[in-house]
Amino acid sequence: MSKDKALLRINQLKEQLNLWSKQYYVDDNPSVDDTEYDLALKELISLETLYPELITSDSPSQKVGGMVSEKFLKITHKTPMLSLGNVFSFDEFLDFNTQISKISNTLDNQYVAELKIDGLSISLVYENGSLVSAATRGNGVVGEDVTINARTIKSIPLKISKKERVEVRGEIYLSKAEFEKINQKRLLNNEDLFINPRNAAAGTLRQLDSKIVASRNLDAFLYYYISDDSNNLTQYQSILKLNELGFKTNKETMLCKNLDEIKAYIDKYTNLKNDLDYQIDGIVFKINDKNLQNSLGFTSKIPKWAIAYKFPAEIKQTKLLDIFATVGRTGKITYNAKLEPVFLMGAKISAATLNNAEYIKTKDLRINSIVKIKKAGDVIPEVIEAIKDEDFYKLEKFKPALYCPNCHSLLEKNENEVDQFCINSSCSMKILRSLQHFSSREAMNIVSLGDRSLEILFNLKIIQNISDIYKLEEYKDQILAIDNFGLKSYLNLIDSINMSKNNSLEKVLFGLGIRHIGSKTAKILARKYQNIDNLMSASYDELIQINSIGESLALSIIDWFKIEDNLKLIDELKSFNINFNYLGAKINSDSIIANKSFVITGTLTRPREEFKTLIENNAGKVIGSISKQTDYLLAGNNVGSKLEKAKKLGVKIIDEQQFFDLLKSEKG
């Protein structure tokens, strides 16, 4: 593949992986299974290996994972909460063990085997025997402060006997039984149902009301111990130490002394995983010997002494009862499968996504055929293929829909696109989905206006367009008359709506639903133009000069602001005092480091994210690897091979003080 084609594909993969990552870690609403994510990440890494000069610091290959919400205070982890490498078969685990043996000089390495709980990672810090902080993983460097909520979890002790500073890490989760109870209650209250236990656990831990957290019976398994004596203990002894201090650990954890025991452990829980009362998505194997752990060390992303074995996707056969279409906020038509119910990964499955008509044609899926479905992780199941037996060919071939399933307008399909679209601006389902998008967490974050509540208000004609959201106080009596919608719910709704008025420009820009503008592009445009009026005045030629803004996106922006109804909406939102200014740091385009590229290496006195932010706020960019095109290597202590490579290529090397001096100097 040529470098230009590789760059194009890398950018596509980065955007897709970052979106999937955000959906999983921030929105708690994954849209793809782990297998699809891992394959895309693998493709990205292979392309970046081929062209290392194309690696950037925002690449998913360089990230620990997750992102930090804006709802809680932030806590910087003293030791970064890293991700884990993955293997997908026992053979791949053997390859991992072979790499370990190059340091340990034996293939019989001892591992601690832990079930990989599908929950939310947590870091607990104790000082003088008291719990002083609890933080989520966040982006691995900075997490969310959830101390008040963590205190309500019965399996997290508020006091321990050890007086020295202790950090304990583990996983917050919700049992399957508690998950069912919560969803039953939400169903009775006309609230949106949680997708899965992980989604429910994450949503609960991020509640602002700790009483709600306490009522949902979150649980925790702890597995990682950091203190003054932790280096003197093996990994398994650390688990025993946690038990001794009163922490709940997983009783299924086992010290495996050889490869046979590891294989037996994998086989056992591959078969038993659905019988547990909590969800797991794999097994984590950690080297037991701490000295060997220290010798193996870390990459910037993962420990070299631990690996996650991921269970293969579960596949079952069932009958495809029907294929039906739905319409989204942009008018895009999505096809779905109605299935004969079947149990898969402990859940009853009766539907699956089929994406678009081209997907169905390619797989030649037919109504009443027997199909294979798979489910890896906790997302919507996927139809893999039809069983093409003798009966299959007697069935009628699939025919794409001609009309919108909601408003019955004729569908359109561009020659170069696989998707069909409803272009009727009055389509009620498009309008409802647009409203739900506007109020979503990633957009305006109107937390008390969930999809179900919005649908009820939409059907009652109380909300028919975006500006109606900000008129709800006029409908107080009508809203209070709705079943299960009391005064407290109403007041929370009004508070959420009023809070949304103070969002930064990128939030409302994303919420408006301009085609091709995702959350990342909205942030780029907001930082560039600072307010909505400047963006409205931008020309096509000006827009396409912005990095990552292509022709179709530039045209989409220009066309959107030409529509009279859209301009009227902006004016109405301004009349409700919606903020249309960018509230983030302003980019200093006149900085001496504008358009300069930096690679950061070694241990610094401040978090790397802080240096990255400083560079980006001064119009510079941070990349992942050294090349001839790199302008500066910012080097801390304990630097690795990047320093030698920079010297060899003649890249300017600076330390922290020189970096700050550079920022203070004027452009010549």
From Swiss-Prot:
Report the active site residues.
116 (n6-amp-lysine intermediate)
Which residues are involved in binding Zn(2+)?
A: 404, 407, 422, 427
Q: Does the keyword Glycoprotein apply?
A: no
Sorted alphabetically, the Gene Ontology cellular component annotations on this record are: cytosol
**InterPro entries, alphabetized:** BRCT_dom, BRCT_dom_sf, DisA/LigA_HHH, DNA_ligase, DNA_ligase_AS, DNAligase_adenylation, DNAligase_N, NA-bd_OB-fold
Which GO terms are recorded in the biological process aspect for this UniProt protein? DNA repair; DNA replication
Functional summary from the UniProt entry? DNA ligase that catalyzes the formation of phosphodiester linkages between 5'-phosphoryl and 3'-hydroxyl groups in double-stranded DNA using NAD as a coenzyme and as the energy source for the reaction. It is essential for DNA replication and repair of damaged DNA.
Q: What is this protein called?
A: DNA ligase
Biological source species: Mycoplasma mycoides subsp. mycoides SC (strain CCUG 32753 / NCTC 10114 / PG1)
Taxonomic lineage: Bacteria, Bacillati, Mycoplasmatota, Mollicutes, Mycoplasmataceae
> What is this protein's gene name?
ligA
